[in-house]
UniProtKB/Swiss-Prot annotation:
Protein name per its UniProtKB record: 4-hydroxy-tetrahydrodipicolinate reductase
Location in the cell: Cytoplasm
Record: residues binding NAD(+): 8-13, 34, 98-100, 122-125
Xref: CDD domains: DHDPR_N (cd02274)
Pfam family, one: DapB_N
Protein's gene: dapB
Predominant subcellular localization, coarse grouping: cytoplasm
GO cellular component terms attached to this protein's record: cytosol
Role played: Catalyzes the conversion of 4-hydroxy-tetrahydrodipicolinate (HTPA) to tetrahydrodipicolinate.
UniProt source species: Geotalea uraniireducens (strain Rf4) (Geobacter uraniireducens)
Catalysis performed (reactions): (S)-2,3,4,5-tetrahydrodipicolinate + NAD(+) + H2O = (2S,4S)-4-hydroxy-2,3,4,5-tetrahydrodipicolinate + NADH + H(+); (S)-2,3,4,5-tetrahydrodipicolinate + NADP(+) + H2O = (2S,4S)-4-hydroxy-2,3,4,5-tetrahydrodipicolinate + NADPH + H(+)
Biological process terms in GO annotation: diaminopimelate biosynthetic process; lysine biosynthetic process via diaminopimelate
Length: 267
């Protein structure tokens, strides 16, 4: 039985993860964590998940929660995730991180900390999205430089980072397949007389509004034809189920930094 703790247990995503753990054979909720001063600290974690009481109290004691689990699932912010990763490292516990918005420097720090424990760091835990990553690489290699690439993503109005971590990863996957440096070819803004589109650029466009869970479309646009590869998330349950799958997988791995491509055996 894999003992899984959840960081951000009182949030929307945290509740869905707790529900997913309860539905997963071979896994159990061992701890629930929230920030200091959160009004749900001290309450049973099952209520936010729609399960009723499950006998696990939401705590603000990070070290105690980590020490009581095999693996921590974290959907917070890069700053909080790195702190949680450090504490997991000190206690030799695995961690699954689904937070987005990491800078290159923060990702490098995560990789350094992952030398001591197995870590899954993925911008999107969905099986479908990770299949898309593989498909995008294959399509980009086949089409080469003859097709322009544009990426459009849409999320709910509460999302804090832009573009989404998934959209960035899609851009990175395509750029790598085409032998380009994503950081040099990504174009996030077009306005006014900005000149013709360059051959190598990858356009990144963002939509924010309402309660959109998540939509991503990658356009491969040629002369007289185009290919669109789209993934639409209808609920957050796919992310929560994916994170639990990653948690069960990572506890048996060697120290290192992994992503969902590793979890799903897509490499």
């Amino acid at each position: 039985m894999v003992k899984i703790a959840v960081c951000g247990a009182a949030g929307r995503m945290g509740g869905r993860i707790i529900a997913a753990i309860s539905e997963t054979e071979g896994a159990v909720v061992s701890g629930a964590l929230e920030r200091l001063g959160h009004p749900m600290v001290g309450q049973d974690a099952g209520f936010n998940a729609g399960l009723g009481a499950i006998g696990v109290t939401i705590s603000d004691d990070l070290t105690a929660v980590v020490q009581g689990c095999d693996v921590l699932i974290d959907f917070t912010t890069p700053k909080v995730s790195l702190k949680n990763l450090e504490v997991c490292g000190l206690n030799k516990k695995s961690i699954v991180i689904g937070s987005t918005g990491f800078t290159p420097e923060e990702r490098a720090l995560a990789a350094e900390l992952a030398k001591d424990i197995p870590v899954v760091l993925a911008p999107n835990m969905s099986v479908g999205v990770n299949v898309c990553f593989k498909v995008l690489a294959d399509v980009a290699k086949i089409l080469g430089d003859d097709f322009d690439v544009e990426i459009v993503e849409a999320h709910h109005k509460m999302k804090k980072d832009s573009p989404s971590g998934t959209a960035v990863r899609m851009g990175e996957v395509v750029a790598e397949a085409l032998g380009r440096d994503y950081n040099k070819v990504a174009n996030f803004h077009r306005e006014g007389i900005c000149g013709e589109r360059t051959k190598d650029e990858i356009g990144m466009q963002t939509i924010r509004g309402g309660d959109i869970v998540g939509e991503h479309t990658v356009y491969f646009i040629g002369m007289g034809e185009r290919i669109e590869i789209t993934h639409r998330a209808h609920t957050r349950d796919m992310f929560s189920r994916g994170s639990v799958r990653a948690a069960k997988w990572v506890v048996s791995q060697k120290p290192g930094l992994y992503d969902m491509q590793d979890v799903l055996g897509l490499r």
